[in-house]
Structure formats: structure tokens, C-alpha cells
Amino acid sequence: MKAAVLYGKEDVRVEEVPERALAPGEVRIRIEAALTCGTDLKVFKRGYHAKMIVPPAVFGHELAGEISEVTPGARGWPVGERVVVANSAPCGECFFCRNGQENLCDDLLFLNGAYAESIAVPARLVQKNLLRLKPSTGFRDAALTEPLACVAQGIADCQLRAGQRVLVIGAGPIGLMATVLAVQSGCTVDVLGRGKQRLERSRALGARTTIPNDTPEDFPESLRTLLAANEPWDVVFEAVGKPATWEAGTQLVRKGGLVNLFGGCPAGTKMALDTGRMHYSGLTLKASFHHTPRTIRRALELIESGVVRAADFVDGECPLSRLPELFKSMSAGNRFVKTQVQVDR
């Protein structure tokens, strides 16, 4: 089959690879929709991900498709079933799984390989995070399930209440999804981010106001403007993953407020905090990571009910054969929110 194989830092090659034979309890999915993701871009730039993927390996993890092969142990999953699968499944046995924190599982089993014609799904994922689609659900919509589940986890961690004022920092796909879910929670949402079109999309998705920050050099001035013109927010949802925006969250939240440090920074990154403000303002810092089987199902519910639509997030298309060029373009800063990768069949 054709697949995009990650060999190392900024080294992706589309080539013919053999399909892996299925083990008992596994299924194979013919991939009908695969989407780009900021995490995949990080993997492309760094050449690996300590938890998710070690090269050489087929990469990509947001996908939906149709079951094309089953093994006797995969009961209840017929060939032809339309499905979406998450990119991991917890063990169900460790301390964190037993305490309802499956996203922190000590033995998360990750699945990569969305940028290919098909993918073999391990038995644990079949059991825990393989979901049927309604006949009316499009594959492109369904492929949003995994990132939306991560955002749903982050929003749940914020414990939002109707009427709260929320600032989302970042207008990429994660920030846009956070905007939708915060608005759905009855909150008033403002967005600080880059890119005219992305900020326009934030408003279309329910943001009250948007604050442009077109270059990193503008960020200190943007903060001063924000602080001078606005009351601090009840909740700040950071969806960029840079020390400057993490630190900004602690400056823009009100006394007693909560900052969700959702955007992941590179390992070893340090940030500076005003300890006096942290202590005397009673701030809560919360970090959210990944998803659980519950939030995977919640995400698909939001998609199938029409709350989240691919049309609002997927604004680019690219054939699998051009994937290396696409990631180079993404690395250089193209402004697509998400791109659908189409398999050349």
C-alpha cells in the first residue's frame, strides 16, 4: 500500500509498504479521510515523538474509514462498517485508569498510520476506542473526533459555568474548537490570535471579540492593550504552546481564576511566573493532556449532532503523494487550519 513514512527530522517519504498481517481481535480500516494536526507537525519538525512514534514509521493519527478486514476475535465488527478510531487506548488496569484518569494511563497504546491507504487497528483499540458512525456522518467530519476529544477533555477540566468570561489564546484548530465548546457551555468568549481569516472564523464560531497578534514581537504590546482595555477573564485557555503565552495566561486571568495550559511546549521548556500574583490572587493552573474513552464518545456526539463540522475547520486538501511538500509548507507557516489528505487510489 502507499503510505507516508517518517524517517527522521523533516524527512517524510511516500512509498510502497507492506500491509501488516492482522493478529486476533484486530481489524483493518480502509482510510477514507485523514487530517493534518499540529502534533504531526511537531513530529515532522522533531523527527520523533517520545510517547507516540519512533521512526521509521507510518505517521498521522486523525482518520476515519471503512472496515475492510476482520479477524475472528473482533466480534461485532463486520466488513463494510463505517468507523472512526482514536489514536490510543488506555490499559484499564493502572492506577490512573482505575481512578478515571485514562488520559494519564501508564501504558497508553498509541496508533499511528493515518497517512496511508489502510491501517491495522490493535485489539485494545478495537475494544475501547473504535466507534460506529451514523449513516449520515461524513468521514471528513468523523476524522475530527480525536482532536475534538482532546479539547473536550480540556474544557471539562476548566469546569466552565454559564456566564463566565473566557479568553482563548490561539486561533488554530484547537483554539477554534475550544471557542465552540466554551460558547456551547454558555460562556462569553474572546480570542487572541494570529491570522485575519482565523480570527474571522473565531467570530463566526461564536467569539464575541478577537484580538489580533500578528507577530511574536507584537505580543508584549498586545498584552498591555488587553490589560488596559479589559477586565481580567474568569478562565484563560492557552492553545499555542509557547512560554510567552503560558505566562500571559497568568497575567490575563482574574483573581481566583483558572488558566488551562493546554498547548504543549517542547520537553525541557521553562517559564517564568510571578509567584506573588500566583499566591495572593489565588490562581489555579491546570494542564490538560490527551483524551479518554468518555471524551472520544462525547466528541463524536458533538460531531453527529452538528455542533462541530469539518466545514468550519478543514480548509485545505492535498493528495497523499504531495504530503512531504505539504508538511514543508506547514512548517513554513501556511495558514490552513486543517488539511484533508486524500489517498491516491
PLM regions and their residue ranges:
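NAD(P)H dinucleotide-binding glycine-rich loop of Rossmann-like/cofactor-binding domains
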Residues: C91-I169
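Mid-domain Rossmann-like dinucleotide-binding core that forms the NAD(H)/NADP(H) cofactor-binding site
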Residues: R82, G138-P216
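C-terminal hydrophobic helical "lid"/dimerization subdomain
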Residues: E247-Q251, P293-R345
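Glycine-rich cofactor phosphate-binding loops and adjacent beta1-alpha1 units
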Residues: E200, A204-T284, D344
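Residues in the short beta-alpha loop(s) of Rossmann-like NAD(P)-binding domains
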Residues: G195, C265, H291
